[in-house]
A protein has these predicted regions:
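Short glycine- and acidic-rich boundary segments immediately preceding or forming the N-terminal edge
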Residues: 1-18
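A broad, low-specificity signal for short, low-complexity segments enriched in glycine/proline
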Residues: 3-6, 47-48, 96
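Short amphipathic alpha-helical surface micro-motifs
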Residues: 7-10, 23-26, 115-120
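RNase H-like nuclease fold core
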Residues: 13-65, 76-77
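RNase H catalytic domain
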Residues: 32-35, 75-151
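Short, charged/polar low-complexity linear motifs in solvent-exposed/disordered segments
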Residues: 52, 70-72, 113-114
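Short, charged, low-complexity patches
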Residues: 63-68, 116
Length: 153
């Protein structure tokens, strides 16, 4: 109970900073146990902490792939719900891949991670439908952990 009770306070420490994140917004994050390893990702409403999507675990992934997929899924979710929100992510690599509209992973394709590569191909195709998007870096130093963080560090 104590862990649960203290989480919302810790997650929302950014409310009291001089330059808090923009609201409303969507925060995305990924978790990967090892590299490669089991990968999952999710998106949450930054303000409320409500989880709006979650996927995985998928075997044989990397954190950057998860972040890339989470951003694209977030863009799709915002478009489907006709919302013009900022997306916060904490992976510079994934954001660069989004801007290039290409997941530039060096991960070798294997039988165990074939599903991930199917998701990557679908995400890259989906990116062709987005003319503009607002993705910003989550400022962990100023705001604490991203609200979508899985808390496994």
């Amino acid at each position: 109970y104590e862990d649960f009770k203290s989480k919302p306070h810790a997650v929302r420490q950014w409310l009291f900073t001089p330059n808090p994140p923009m609201l409303p917004s969507l925060s995305v994050d990924a978790a990967c146990s090892g590299s490669p390893g089991p990968l999952e990702y999710r998106g949450v409403n930054t303000e409320t902490g409500e989880q709006v999507f979650r996927a995985g675990p998928f075997p044989g992934g990397t954190n950057n792939i998860g972040e890339f997929l989470a951003i694209v899924r977030g863009m799709e979710w915002l478009a489907r719900n006709k919302l013009d929100w900022v997306i916060y992510a904490d992976s510079d690599t994934a954001v660069a891949w989004i801007r290039a509209r290409k997941c530039n992973t060096k991960l070798a394709r294997t039988a165990s991670n074939a599903m991930l590569f199917q998701l990557i191909a679908r995400a890259e195709e989906s990116l062709k439908n987005f003319r503009s998007f607002r993705i910003m870096k989550w400022d962990t130093k100023a705001w604490g952990e991203n609200p979508a963080d899985f808390g496994r560090k």
